Amino acid sequence: MRMSLLFYRTSKNANKEASVLSYELLQKAGYLFKTSKGIYSYTPLFQRVILKMTEIIREELNAIGGQEVCLPLLQPAELWEKTGRWKAFLSEKLLYVLKDRENKAMCLAPTHEEVVSEFVAQWLTGREQLPIHLYQIGTKFRDEIRPRFGLMRAKEFLMEDSYTFSDSPEQMEEQYAKLRLAYQRIFDRLNLKYVIVAADGGKIGKGKSEEFHVLCSLGEDTICVSGSYGANVEAAQAIPPSYVYDSNLLPVEEVATPNIRTIEDLEVFFNTPKHKILKTLVVKTCQKDSEKFFAICIRGDRQINLTKVASFLQVDDCELASEEEILKHLHVEKGFIGPLYCPIPCYADETTRPMTNFICANNQKDVHCKHVNWGRDIPLPAFGDFLLAEAGDLCPQNGGAPYEIFQGVEVAHIFNLGTRYTESFSVGFQDKNGDKQLCWMGTYGIGVGRTLAACIEQLADNKGLVWPLAVAPFSITILYNGGDTEGEATALQLYQSLNTEGFEPLLDDRNERLGFKLKDSDLLGIPYKLIIGKSFQSTGLLEIESRSGEKCNVSPENLLDWCSKNLPCHTRKIPPLREQN
């Protein structure tokens, strides 16, 4: 492709909303333009990157028996109502909802578990057809409250989603392992640093679940890693530091604490460390339009993990109650809630079990108690694991070795769903006894745009984008000084030769200085530059420089040999951009 014909434009200034590097560079380099908040138009440059990314995905999924399908973006509410997810998604206000001319409720697809389950239910006639692995690569929609970070959190985005149906839990696990390995190969081909971590399934399902995270400083997710084991901080099992508490139980005392509401204030007021203070938080659950409130006690030096609390309470999710809700239901202000005389069900984290003579609130404004003890002053509660893991906590899955904490961008998520969806849609087969058996389902997804944005966050430098060779829009840029007629003639000849052989050259034929062209090539993230400079006239050698700065010289006669060893050939995979006369 000639740059003079390419539909693109670089920009010195990014959109004011470009708060992250990936969004800023994609705009500056002319890869995308903002259509509306969270909605973007892609230029031919970015479309080529996406085509290469999706080609890698197809190759790896086809290699394990995946079959590509196309599922509808417009989905009837009645399918979602069968699984109970219509109300759940509506409550989060993330669905794009509309009605057809018959007044039937529809949504724009955020995911396809319901649709594919109904699809397979119509097709499946016997056990011998299993396992089956269907996948698609298409657009998804989420009405994000705060779309931000460019492709990291958009309202419209591209995803690969796979669905497997099996005849048994064992076969489901086999399919899970195959997809997991295929996803690893996909990210390995991008040369990304990533980790696979245990995760919570959220609203999709409560079975086995893992996330793939690309490590980068921007990462919205906190990842706990110990040796080869990793987990999202919300799912990480951890052993926090333990402390020795008093064995001599002291008489409980009420202490006036005017306007002393926070753990930090209590630490100073009582001159005692945080781990000797009991912190009580009120959480709210909402199941079948019924709100319930619970008190959760944790050590004062730790943070609550609402995902673990929801799992303990056997609900889909929960949230911290607002100050208004606390005042309405407990008749006490936030900051003075405690397990003493608590009017709602109360549970405590395991790390609070050995605490003695601790400080806590007693549900009276401006009053706390000290020397409080379980069993004597407060009935012994049910205990559970309610803590967020932290750096230095010990990992039970890695022999008690400590966790390290990293930031990551979630780029893929894999789930074992069991029979949650297949039961709702009666997806099954008859066994040898004539009894109906349900299929066991798995769901898997890669965020294509998020993965490419994560590539940028991890690999970009102060010059611009740095695309992995596997997905770069062009492999090599041919550069010469504008106005150099001999250099232009050589460049055109080399361009035609490389183009014929399928090596995807980009010819910068603009009438610009060589230095200007070099900077643009770096900004675009093209892996290699083929430079026809002053030295070519004296030595007859071409200079090749990689995006990382490594240089070598080759003769025009040996250029194709160098390309065959260093560049991918995309003669059949990616259609060339059409050129004009």
UniProtKB/Swiss-Prot annotation:
Its EC number is 6.1.1.15. Changing residue 104 to E: In strain: E/UW-5/Cx. Keywords: Aminoacyl-tRNA synthetase, ATP-binding, Cytoplasm, Ligase, Nucleotide-binding, Protein biosynthesis. Gene3D superfamilies: Anticodon-binding domain (3.40.50.800), Bira Bifunctional Protein, Domain 2 (3.30.930.10), YbaK/aminoacyl-tRNA synthetase-associated domain (3.90.960.10). One of its GO terms (biological process) is prolyl-tRNA aminoacylation. GO terms for molecular function: aminoacyl-tRNA deacylase activity; ATP binding; proline-tRNA ligase activity. Transmembrane segments: none annotated. It is found in: Cytoplasm. It catalyses: tRNA(Pro) + L-proline + ATP = L-prolyl-tRNA(Pro) + AMP + diphosphate. GO terms for cellular component: cytosol. Disulfide bonds: none annotated. CDD domains: ProRS-INS, ProRS_anticodon_short, ProRS_core_prok. Belongs to the class-II aminoacyl-tRNA synthetase family. ProS type 1 subfamily. Catalyzes the attachment of proline to tRNA(Pro) in a two-step reaction: proline is first activated by ATP to form Pro-AMP and then transferred to the acceptor end of tRNA(Pro). As ProRS can inadvertently accommodate and process non-cognate amino acids such as alanine and cysteine, to avoid such errors it has two additional distinct editing activities against alanine. One activity is designated as 'pretransfer' editing and involves the tRNA(Pro)-independent hydrolysis of activated Ala-AMP. Homodimer. Consists of three domains: the N-terminal catalytic domain, the editing domain and the C-terminal anticodon-binding domain. This is Proline--tRNA ligase. It comes from Chlamydia trachomatis serovar D (strain ATCC VR-885 / DSM 19411 / UW-3/Cx). The gene is proS.
